[in-house]
Amino acid sequence: MARGSNKADKIAALISAFRTSGNLDRAFDNRAAEALSVNLTDLHCLNIVENRGGVTAGALAAEAGLTTGAVTGVVDRLERAGYARRVPDPADRRRVRIEVTDHFYASADEIWRPVAADWKTELARRFSGDQLDLIAAFLDATNELTRRHLERISPPR
C-alpha cells in the first residue's frame, strides 16, 4: 500500500486497503460457501450463530437483516446439511436456540484453520503488540462507523 506524506493521503491509502480486504473477504466467503455447499446468506447466518455461540431465530433475523420467515428457511437448509440444529433455550424452554454442529466445525476447520494459522504467524512476525492493539482499535472504529451507516441506509427489521 502506497502511503502519502499527509494525513489525507494516508486515510485514502487505508480506505483503499480496507476496500481490497473487503473484496478479498467476499471472494473467500464465495469459495467457502461453495466448498460447504451452502449459499452466501446461509454462510453469513452460520457465521453469526458460531460467533455468538448460538442464537434465537429472532436474534439471528435481526443481526442478519432477514425476516423471521426467511431465517426459518435458512435454518431448515442448515439442519438438512448437518451444519446447525435447533435446541431448547435453557433460559426459556418455550424458545428455541440455533447452534452449529460438530459437523460444521469439522467442515469449517478444513477451510479456516490454515487461514487462522497464517494470520497468527504472519501478524505476530510483522507487528508488535502495540501495533496489533492499534490495528484492532482501527477495525473496531471502522466496524462502529459501518454499523451506523447500515442503520442509516436501512433500519434493522
Residue ranges: model-predicted function:
Residues 28-67:
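N-terminal helix-turn-helix DNA-binding core of bacterial DNA-binding proteins
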Residues 53-96:
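Canonical helix-turn-helix DNA-binding module
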Residues 18-28, 64, 107, 111-123, ...:
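Alpha-helical linker/hinge and terminal dimerization helices associated
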Residues 5, 9-12, 36, 40, ...:
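Residues at secondary-structure transition points
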Residues 1-5, 130-157:
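C-terminal regulatory/oligomerization modules of transcriptional regulators
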Residues 1-36, 81:
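N-terminal leader segment of winged-helix/HTH proteins
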Residues 79-133:
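Charged, amphipathic alpha-helical coiled-coil/dimerization segments
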